[in-house]
Amino acid sequence: VSLDGAVDYSLQSKIVDGKLYVDQGLIAGCAGGGFENICAAADIIKGKYIGADEFTFSVYPASTPIYMELVKNGAVADLIESGAIVKTAFCGPCFGAGDTPANNAFSIRHSTRNFPNREGSKLQSGQIASVALMDARSIAATAANKGFLTPATDLDVQYKGQKYHFDSKIYANRVFDSHGVADPSVEIKFGPNIKDWPEMQPLPQNL
């Protein structure tokens, strides 16, 4: 609790008919957004939907090649059909730049890091939220149960165990490899807030 206890927060308010209700589920980050995690989540959520209440479910694949493979094998379609939002490969949930939980919200997430602002971005103004780290499968099971906290072990799921196939074309088509082909004559474009290195004296032989 922030502000020396001045903010009143309790998970008791999240209990509905004896079950704990979650406001937000996230599968994200370079670890949480792995191919196997998201495929398993899609297997769990397939044919179900997350409901139209306050609960939200977002999935961030760990990389663009992983994202493309999930599109090819149908996992993205299953997730989107359920009501999940599948976003681009982005570190936002880890450092508070994406899907920051709302005030008094309870968020469950399989993500990699725990930076400031991840649990609410305005603590100094009295905002507070609760975040629990959880495995991707149980987050998907909770989403399939419309936001009521549910372990994946409670569901009978046939996991497809799909294999990942890396496709390098994404990087080959978009990322410039300058190794061995550098061209000093190409002018580097600078924005108004970026300046060149200041002129520096070379280091002497002995400091």
Predicted segments with their positions:
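Fe-S-dependent hydro-lyases/dehydratases of central metabolism
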Residues: 1-207
